[in-house]
Amino acid sequence: QDEKRPRTAFTGDQLARLKREFSENKYLTEQRRTCLAKELNLNESQIKIWFQNKRAKMKKASGVKNQLALQLMAQGLYNHSSSSSSSSSSSSSIFLLA
């Protein structure tokens, strides 16, 4: 059974460096990721995931919706909004688009 790796607690210095790098480039080359990992004493996957998460967070904060998502929402087939509505009995449905 595979155990999940514990959550990485980045230091303030590591976060500051990652944020500075992100402000210059939203995407890293493999070479840049390798250098950053060595510089910050992290492994490359930690750097990669941090950048992926940061891009996703920015995309979500921008409020820009994907065109396909808008079409599916109009058809009532898609709603991934994080509203605070509580439904005690939620049912799952699978839709196949032909």
From Swiss-Prot:
Biological process terms from the Gene Ontology for this record are: neuron differentiation; segment polarity determination
**Stated family:** Belongs to the engrailed homeobox family.
What is the superkingdom listed in this entry's lineage? Eukaryota
Tell me the DNA-binding residue spans.
Answer: 3-62
One GO MF term on file is: RNA polymerase II cis-regulatory region sequence-specific DNA binding
For this protein, the record's CDD domains field holds: homeodomain
**Region forming the signal peptide:** none
Q: GO cellular component terms?
A: nucleus
Compartments, record wording? Nucleus
PTM statement from Swiss-Prot or TrEMBL = Phosphorylated in the Ser-rich domain.
The function of this protein is: This protein specifies the body segmentation pattern.
Taken from the record, one Pfam family name reads Engrail_1_C_sig
Q: Region labeled Disordered — which residues?
A: 79-98
The protein's name in its UniProt record:
Homeobox protein Ht-En
Q: Which InterPro entries match?
A: Engrailed_Homeobox_TFs, HD, HD_engrailed, HD_metazoa, Homeobox-engrailed_C-terminal, Homeobox-engrailed_CS, Homeobox_CS, Homeodomain-like_sf
Q: Where is the composition biased (Low complexity)?
A: 81-98
Which cysteines are disulphide-bonded? none
Swiss-Prot/TrEMBL keywords = Developmental protein, DNA-binding, Homeobox, Nucleus, Segmentation polarity protein
